[in-house]
UniProtKB/Swiss-Prot annotation:
Belongs to the protein kinase superfamily. BUD32 family. This protein is considered an atypical serine/threonine kinase, because it lacks the conventional structural elements necessary for the substrate recognition as well as a lysine residue that in all other serine/threonine kinases participates in the catalytic event. BUD32 has protein kinase activity in vitro, but in the context of the EKC/KEOPS complex, the catalytic subunit KAE1 switches the activity of BUD32 from kinase into ATPase. The gene is BUD32. Its main location: cytoplasm. It catalyses: L-seryl-[protein] + ATP = O-phospho-L-seryl-[protein] + ADP + H(+); L-threonyl-[protein] + ATP = O-phospho-L-threonyl-[protein] + ADP + H(+). The active site is at D113 (proton acceptor). The lineage of its organism: Eukaryota, Fungi, Fungi incertae sedis, Microsporidia, Unikaryonidae. Its EC number is 3.6.-.-, 2.7.11.1. PANTHER family: EKC_KEOPS COMPLEX SUBUNIT TP53RK, NON-SPECIFIC SERINE/THREONINE PROTEIN KINASE. This is EKC/KEOPS complex subunit BUD32. Signal peptide: none annotated. Pfam families: RIO1.
Length: 197
């Protein structure tokens, strides 16, 4: 069964075993600049998908890429957010998710939009939607990735499950990232205080 979805950044359609993601043009940008930005982002996302496959990290397999379009394998399963909402043991799902995000960060992949809607639960948990992703070795970037996730969880789920998430996340390189996360949280609280003060 196929589907067609248009978001702010791309048009996504799926049929059979493949998903086609075509980046949307921005009418307010000069056409030549728009094409350069779109093609650059498409190449970056394709590069990350190749790296994920090479490392054995669960994510859609890249089939082909051209210009503004990526063709990838369709991942069968349920959006993780829905699975968590109906699960008798959501803590276990959050621990598995933490372990997967840890693998991304160990590989220096910053997802850029960590929410439970950007993971699919099938035979395992798969990370999807790498449209905002990039490569970085900086603890700061990994910490911001986690901070965005914390905010998303606070809006969609019970924040108590973050403890399970971090149980799964703990491992290689996590100590320095979590230390930096403390600084990022403090900065976020100061911004919020200024906004409401």
């Amino acid at each position: 069964m196929g589907f067609h979805f248009q978001g702010a950044e791309s048009i996504i359609s799926a049929d059979g075993e493949t998903v086609v993601k075509k980046r949307a043009r921005k009418a307010y940008r000069i056409e030549a600049l728009d094409l350069k930005i779109i093609n650059g982002r498409t190449k970056r996302e394709a590069k990350i998908l190749r790296k994920l496959e090479a490392l054995g990290i669960p994510a859609p397999r890249l089939i082909s890429t051209y210009g503004d379009t990526i063709v990838m394998e369709k991942v069968e399963g349920t959006v993780l957010k829905e699975m968590i909402d109906s699960s008798d043991n959501p803590g276990a799902l959050f621990r598995d998710l933490g372990a997967l995000v840890s693998r991304l960060h160990i590989a220096d992949i910053i997802h850029g939009d960590l929410t439970t809607s950007n993971f699919i639960h099938g035979s395992k948990i798969y990370a999807i939607d790498f449209g905002l992703s990039y490569i970085s070795r900086k603890d700061e970037d990994k910490a911001v990735d986690l901070y965005v996730f914390e905010k998303a969880v606070g809006c969609a789920h019970d924040a108590k499950f973050l403890e399970d998430f971090y149980c799964g996340y703990m491992g290689e390189g996590s100590e320095s990232v979590l230390k930096k996360l403390g600084t990022v949280r403090l900065r976020g609280r100061k911004r919020e205080a200024m906004a409401f003060g």
